C-alpha cells in the first residue's frame, strides 16, 4: 500500500504543533537519539537534548499558525521531507513572528519520527 506523503505530513504537523503549543515536554517521543535539531544557530542531537532546548525557550504561551506546508518523498525507503512556513503568536503578543521549519520524517513501524528538524525565525 502506498503512503500519501502529503496526508502524513499534514497530520504530523498538526499533531506536532498542537503538542508543542500545549505541552512541549511531551515531544520527546517524536525524536530518537540520532535525531538532530537546528534551532536558529543551536544544534542539538538526541531526544533528551532536543526537548530540553524546546522547553527552555523563553515564553510561556505559544500558538503556531501554518501558512504553507509542502511535502515530498525523501527516499525510496518512505522518508518524507516537510517544509512549513507560518506565524508564531508568543505570549498573546499582537505582532506574530514568521518562521520556517523543515522536518525529515523517517518511517518507524506504523508511524514516523523526526530525524532532522531545522527551525528559523524569518526577520524582514
Curated annotation (Swiss-Prot):
UniProt entry tagged with the keyword Transcription regulation: no
Keyword Cytoplasm attached: yes
InterPro entries in the record: NTF2, NTF2-like_dom_sf, NTF2_dom, Nuclear_transport_factor_2_euk
PANTHER family reported in the protein's UniProt record: NUCLEAR TRANSPORT FACTOR 2 (PTHR12612)
Cellular localization per UniProt: Cytoplasm
Residues in NTF2 domain copies: 8-121
Biological process, per Gene Ontology: nucleocytoplasmic transport; protein transport
Pfam family, any one: NTF2
Protein keywords: Cytoplasm, Protein transport, Transport
GO terms under cellular component: cytoplasm
Gene3D superfamilies assigned: 3.10.450.50
Free-text function comment from the UniProt entry: Facilitates protein transport into the nucleus. Could be part of a multicomponent system of cytosolic factors that assemble at the pore complex during nuclear import.
Disulphide connectivity of cysteines: none
Name assigned to this protein: Nuclear transport factor 2
Amino acid at each position: 500500500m502506498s503512503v500519501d506523503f502529503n496526508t502524513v505530513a499534514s497530520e504530523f504537523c498538526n499533531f506536532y504543533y498542537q503538542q508543542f503549543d500545549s505541552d512541549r515536554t511531551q515531544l520527546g517521543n517524536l525524536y530518537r537519539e540520532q535525531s538532530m535539531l537546528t534551532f536558529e544557530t543551536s544544534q542539538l542531537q538526541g531526544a533528551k537534548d532536543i526537548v530540553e532546548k524546546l522547553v527552555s525557550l523563553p515564553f510561556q504561551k505559544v500558538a503556531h499558525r501554518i501558512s504553507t506546508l509542502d511535502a515530498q518523498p525523501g527516499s525510496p525507503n518512505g522518508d518524507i521531507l516537510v517544509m512549513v512556513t507560518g506565524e508564531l503568536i508568543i505570549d498573546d503578543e499582537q505582532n506574530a513572528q514568521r518562521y520556517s521549519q523543515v522536518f525529515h520524517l523517517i518511517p518507524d513501524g506504523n508511524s514516523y519520527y523526526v530525524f532532522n528538524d531545522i527551525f528559523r525565525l524569518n526577520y524582514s
